[in-house]
């Protein structure tokens, strides 16, 4: 304790004992414990003497003054788990008006919160949470209507023989916007957001009406399906044309737009087909070159088990082998560093005992 006090304060006690005599305290020396007991926050009331060593003695940072927190509403109290017992003499006084506005201390002795939550934010949260009862009833009614319509849509679709993809394509024919099969599936399963469900419901309602009244809707849907299938058809290139493209690629891997147009005219292909073919061919070349480089690196590094198998004899002693095989027992291992010629361990034969003989 004395060493700690000497390190924290630039005061040194006199060599002698206490008193007013020659062994008493010298002029300008102050007892650290007395000095600590009189210290208080700037602008605040001092703490009476005789309380004991302050927080600096125990190696704990002092509490900040009350005005450093939220407008003087904070309370500086002892922290939990530091080994200090709260004392009545260490409490700071607060005005009665600020005591109600401050943070209440926990009953279990935990440290209080530094500042209070603004009342305006709490009011805004309450206003968000508290909804108008009429609006909540309207939302619930709309949700029930959406659930009933989703069931009706699914029943109508299955009855007429439409798939979810057919419904999406038919919406594209009728309203100019194609919806995916996933969107229709999520609508029927009520997995879309409330806003998207409300937007999609009028379109699906018109689809139900058209499906009931228009008998040609199925044919329209089939025609649209064929058109979409044609759009997704893969382009096939003849072997002769592919060979010509390969030769041109070796000469110029990245042709310009004018060169692509000239190649398309010569080979009788579309410009987009030629352009896409060159793009795909460049990507294929990059992949093959990277694979070849990795293979070369692997061959240059060599196998981790270079060199031939090296035979090491087992420990001396009898080794029981399989009956009928009288060859010496050796363990074949692969050495990471091959032995030079003439330095390999010569195989040492070990006497092997065969099957035990039964004597009469």
Swiss-Prot record:
GO terms for cellular component: cytoplasm; nucleus. The keyword Cytoplasm applies. The POU-specific domain mediates interaction with PKM. Residues 17-26 have a biased composition (Gly residues). SUPFAM superfamilies: Homeodomain-like, lambda repressor-like DNA-binding domains. InterPro entries: HD, Homeobox_CS, Homeodomain-like_sf, Lambda_DNA-bd_dom_sf, POU, POU_dom, POU_domain_TF. The modification Phosphothreonine is found at residue 235. This is POU domain, class 5, transcription factor 1. Interacts with PKM. Interacts with WWP2. Interacts with UBE2I and ZSCAN10. Interacts with PCGF1. Interacts with ESRRB; recruits ESRRB near the POU5F1-SOX2 element in the NANOG proximal promoter; the interaction is DNA independent. Interacts with ZNF322. Interacts with MAPK8 and MAPK9; the interaction allows MAPK8 and MAPK9 to phosphorylate POU5F1 on Ser-355. Interacts (when phosphorylated on Ser-355) with FBXW8. Interacts with FBXW4. Interacts with SOX2 and SOX15; binds synergistically with either SOX2 or SOX15 to DNA. Interacts with DDX56. The modification Phosphoserine is found at residues 111, 236, 289-290, 355. The lineage of its organism: Eukaryota, Metazoa, Chordata, Craniata, Vertebrata. Transmembrane segments: none annotated. POU5F1/OCT4, SOX2, MYC/c-Myc and KLF4 are the four Yamanaka factors. When combined, these factors are sufficient to reprogram differentiated cells to an embryonic-like state designated iPS (induced pluripotent stem) cells. iPS cells exhibit the morphology and growth properties of ES cells and express ES cell marker genes. Sumoylation enhances the protein stability, DNA binding and transactivation activity. Sumoylation is required for enhanced YES1 expression. Ubiquitinated; undergoes 'Lys-63'-linked polyubiquitination by WWP2 leading to proteasomal degradation. Residues 138-212 form the POU-specific domain. There is a cross-link at residue 123 (Glycyl lysine isopeptide (Lys-Gly) (interchain with G-Cter in SUMO)). GO terms for molecular function: DNA-binding transcription factor activity, RNA polymerase II-specific; RNA polymerase II cis-regulatory region sequence-specific DNA binding. Residues 180-186, 193-196 are annotated as: DNA-binding. A motif (9aaTAD) lies at residues 4-12. The gene is POU5F1. It comes from Macaca mulatta.
């Amino acid at each position: 304790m004395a060493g700690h006090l000497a390190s924290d304060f630039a005061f040194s006690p006199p060599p002698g004992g206490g008193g007013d005599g020659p062994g008493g305290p010298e002029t300008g020396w102050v007892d650290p414990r007395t000095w600590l007991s009189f210290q208080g926050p700037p602008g605040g009331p001092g703490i009476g003497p005789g309380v004991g060593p302050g927080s600096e003695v125990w190696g704990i940072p002092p509490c900040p003054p009350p005005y450093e927190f939220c407008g003087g509403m904070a309370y500086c109290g002892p922290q939990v788990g530091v080994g200090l017992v709260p004392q009545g003499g260490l409490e700071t006084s607060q005005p009665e008006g600020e005591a109600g506005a401050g943070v209440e201390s926990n009953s279990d002795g935990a440290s209080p919160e530094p500042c209070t939550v603004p009342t305006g934010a709490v009011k805004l949260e309450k206003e968000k949470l508290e909804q108008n009862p009429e609006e909540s009833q309207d939302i619930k009614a709309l949700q029930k209507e959406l659930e009933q319509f989703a069931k009706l849509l699914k029943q109508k679709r299955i009855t007429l023989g439409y798939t979810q993809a057919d419904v999406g394509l038919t919406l594209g024919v009728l309203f100019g916007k194609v919806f995916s099969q996933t969107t229709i599936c999520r609508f029927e399963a009520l997995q879309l957001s409330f806003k998207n469900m409300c937007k999609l419901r009028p379109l699906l309602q018109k689809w139900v009406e058209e499906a009931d009244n228009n008998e040609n809707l199925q044919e329209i849907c089939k025609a649209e399906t064929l058109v979409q299938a044609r759009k997704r058809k893969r382009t096939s290139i003849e072997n002769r044309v592919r060979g010509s493209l390969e030769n041109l690629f070796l000469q110029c891997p990245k042709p310009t737009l004018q060169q692509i147009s000239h190649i398309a005219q010569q080979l009788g292909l579309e410009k987009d087909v030629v352009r896409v073919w060159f793009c795909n061919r460049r990507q294929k070349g990059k992949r093959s070159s990277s694979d070849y480089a990795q293979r070369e690196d692997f061959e240059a590094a060599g196998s981790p088990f270079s060199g031939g198998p090296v035979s090491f004899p087992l420990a001396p002693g009898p080794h029981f082998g399989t009956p009928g095989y009288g060859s010496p027992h050796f363990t074949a291992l692969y050495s990471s560093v091959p032995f030079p010629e003439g330095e390999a361990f010569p195989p040492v034969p070990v006497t092997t005992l065969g099957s035990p003989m039964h004597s009469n």
